[in-house]
């Protein structure tokens, strides 16, 4: 994922946010060689896809939401599989695959049983964060054409992000956004398939929630910069992981000042009015929010820190968006 750098006075926040993306993994059973990263929910909320890091590799597993039992999606033995996304009919999963050092990440699509893998991406670009349109005819994804950094204290990374759409076989690629971005989040497509929501940040613009038309590509048709209570930074709020839900509102994560550092809680914003609704309270450090297509369930990672404040493990949580109840999902079968 990208947010997916020239440093401004907020350079510390930018570095923190990049670390936020790099460190988003979960350890299980005390075995640091097994870590869980990004999550995705099937359309009916019955399955979760996660990427599981093993040493220098990572592979995608499907997890039953009722039992927590995990099974491998593919038979890959090298590289890194990340950022899974279910098709709206639940029959396919798209994900990002990085072959290894010296290569760029590309998008792969497989049947939900792991068969019939199909990959497409140019070797000179970095593709990331695929999502399906509700009519199951289009994939929207982000692409970075540059790799490097503008500061000696930052690790090299992909930037100059743009968003594209294509047919399911990777053909008919067309650009959606009229500009490139320093950082971007994963996209989420509206229920009617006519627009997408992302969090963007430019070289000269602060972080914002932006809604783009998928019918008439160009500048954003609407931008929002919600201010949550006790927000971490009023000028440049820390927010990410926007998700459209069926009623047209957007569910996202934002950072506020908590008792023991930042709380990355989940909020809902009404697009037409900007009205905010808080859905969780005191998450601590949390990442990778994803909402099911029916808008009933969200999945995310909640982190635990050690005595020195380092991230050491996290837990997959499920949030009922109606009752606002959260519960942990204990995953087995990752070895």
Q: Which positions does each model-derived feature cover?
A:
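A cross-taxon signal for low-complexity, glycine/charged-rich
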Residues: 2-6, 14-15
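Bacterial N-terminal signal peptides
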Residues: 15-24
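Sequence signature of WD/YWTD-type beta-propeller architectures
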Residues: 27-335
């Amino acid at each position: 994922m990208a947010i997916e750098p020239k440093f401004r006075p907020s350079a510390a926040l930018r570095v923190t946010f990049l670390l936020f993306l790099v460190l988003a993994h979960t350890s299980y059973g005390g075995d640091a060689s097994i870590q869980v990263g990004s999550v995705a929910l099937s359309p009916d909320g019955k399955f979760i896809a996660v990427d599981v890091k093993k040493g220098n590799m990572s592979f995608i597993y499907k997890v039953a939401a009722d039992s927590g039992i995990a099974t491998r999606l593919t038979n890959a033995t090298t590289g890194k599989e990340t950022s899974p996304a279910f098709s709206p009919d639940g029959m396919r999963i798209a994900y990002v695959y990085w072959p290894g050092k010296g290569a760029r990440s590309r998008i792969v699509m497989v049947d939900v049983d792991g068969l019939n893998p199909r990959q497409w991406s140019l070797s000179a670009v970095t593709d990331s964060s695929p999502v399906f349109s509700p009519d199951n005819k289009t994939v929207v994804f982000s692409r970075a054409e540059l790799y490097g950094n503008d500061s000696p204290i930052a690790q090299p990374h992909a930037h100059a992000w743009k968003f594209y759409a294509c047919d399911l076989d990777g053909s008919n690629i067309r650009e959606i956004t009229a500009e490139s971005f320093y950082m971007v989040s994963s996209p989420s497509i509206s229920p009617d398939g006519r627009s997408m929501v992302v969090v963007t940040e430019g070289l000269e613009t602060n972080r914002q929630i932006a809604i783009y038309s998928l019918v008439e590509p160009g500048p954003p048709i609407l931008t929002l910069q919600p201010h949550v209570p006790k927000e971490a930074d009023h000028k440049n709020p820390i927010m990410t992981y926007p998700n459209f839900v069926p009623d047209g509102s957007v569910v996202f994560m934002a950072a506020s000042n908590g008792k023991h550092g930042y709380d990355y809680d989940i909020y809902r914003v009404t697009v037409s009015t900007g009205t905010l609704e808080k859905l969780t309270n005191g998450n601590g450090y949390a990442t990778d929010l994803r909402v099911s297509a029916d808008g009933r369930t969200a999945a995310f990672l909640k982190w635990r820190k050690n005595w020195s404040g380092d991230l050491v493990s996290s837990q997959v949580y499920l949030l009922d968006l109606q009752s606002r109840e959260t519960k942990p999902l204990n995953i087995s079968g990752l070895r």
